[in-house]
Regions:
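Non-catalytic, C-terminal membrane-associated alpha-helical segments of glycosyltransferases
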Residues: 221-225, 238-309
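Glycine-rich, basic loop-to-helix element that forms the pyrophosphate-binding segment
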Residues: 66-82
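Conserved donor NDP-sugar-binding/catalytic core segment of glycosyltransferases
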Residues: 99-131
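Short, flexible, basic/aromatic active-site loop/helix in glycosyltransferases
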Residues: 118-119, 133-152
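Acidic donor-binding loop at a coil-to-helix junction in glycosyltransferase catalytic cores
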Residues: 177-186
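Short, well-formed alpha-helical segments that are part of the catalytic scaffolds
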Residues: 12-25
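Short aromatic/hydrophobic "clamp" motif used to bind/position activated sugar donors
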Residues: 87
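A conserved acidic beta->alpha catalytic loop
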Residues: 22, 36-49, 94
């Protein structure tokens, strides 16, 4: 079975090179792996690197330029060019083991999955030793010990999606270009429509975390944004679910109050548990203030010294 493998990228040449080289090294795949790199930098900064690597790719390697900033724009442009029955997504800060594609496809076939997710193992270059376990967990993705159907969904990096489910020109919501969460909205809708979601326990990838991201200044706003997911999803569907949203807002208020004070006290005391507790408080606050979006992508990355880059 052939598969389209999409790598959206934004001004991350070293990460893109690592991701591509790991894809070139894939083994055990019976069908074609058609690679699509979608460059989301306005200046098209990845073009030269992709053209340099193309002769040694061993697979079809297509470069696309989506100059309009936004992760949803980049994903949508790449999806339009995908012609295979399934699409794999790998981020430009991820590296895949040589059997990754084969294991993702194997999980799809074993469970007749519409969507497959795999684990992510964070690799930190440096971090405050006191909070290192928290940062490793924050940037990693964990799931069941064994492969099989799951009731929930994860993020787009290290996922496989049935191409037929990505209908229209904009399967990823472009209103989420700057704040992210376009994948959450898509997967929520697919789940509501009965899509079969599966976990591939052995199909992991590594994610490289730069020093600029291994800080509470970066992770707590991200935790806030992650916390917004349930409330936002309740109001984004058709029909809207205000009672469900109200439930999550109340849940978030309690969470923010309970963990906020405790987290600040632990941080003042120098406890290594502070980061984990403050993270819970931030996620609770996100459930409550779900309508206030923080920019992490798109035009936010065009500002001088954007967070986490």
């Amino acid at each position: 079975m052939s598969v389209s493998l999409i790598i959206p990228t934004f001004r991350r040449p070293d990460g893109l090179k690592t991701a591509l080289n790991s894809v070139f090294a894939q083994t055990g795949v019976e069908g074609a792996v058609n690679i699509i790199v979608c460059d989301n930098s306005p200046e098209g900064s990845a073009r030269a690197e992709v053209e340099r690597l193309t002769p040694g790719a061993g697979q079809t390697l297509t470069y696309l330029h989506e100059p309009n900033p936004g992760v949803a724009n980049a994903r949508n442009t790449a999806v339009k060019a995908a012609r295979d029955p399934f699409i794999l997504f790998l981020d430009d800060d991820e590296e895949a083991p040589s059997d990754w594609v084969a294991k993702m496809l194997s999980a799809q076939q074993a469970f007749d999955a519409d969507v497959v997710f795999g684990p992510v193992t964070a690799r930190l270059k440096t971090a405050d030793p006191k909070f290192r376990p928290y940062f490793e967990a924050f940037f990693s993705r964990f799931g069941p010990a064994h492969s099989g159907p799951i009731p929930d969904y994860y993020g787009c990096g290290n996922s496989l999606i049935r191409r037929a489910l990505l209908s229209g020109d904009q399967p990823f919501d472009t209103n989420r270009n700057n704040c992210g969460g376009e994948d959450d909205k898509l997967f929520y809708a697919l789940k509501q429509d009965g899509a079969r979601m599966v976990w591939a326990a052995d199909a992991f990838v590594w994610e490289d975390v730069p020093e600029s991201r291994a800080t509470l200044r970066y992770t707590l706003p991200r935790a806030f944004a992650y916390g917004q997911g349930p409330s936002t999803s309740a109001m984004a569907g058709t029909p809207k679910k205000p009672l469900t949203c109200a439930y999550w807002m109340l849940n978030g208020l309690v969470q923010a109050v309970l963990f906020g004070g405790a987290g600040l006290a632990l941080y003042a005391a120098g406890s290594k548990a502070a980061a984990r507790i403050l993270d819970k408080a931030a996620r609770g606050l996100g459930k409550l203030i779900w309508f206030h979006k923080i920019g992490f992508y798109g035009t936010a990355l065009l500002r001088p010294n954007p967070a986490g880059r």
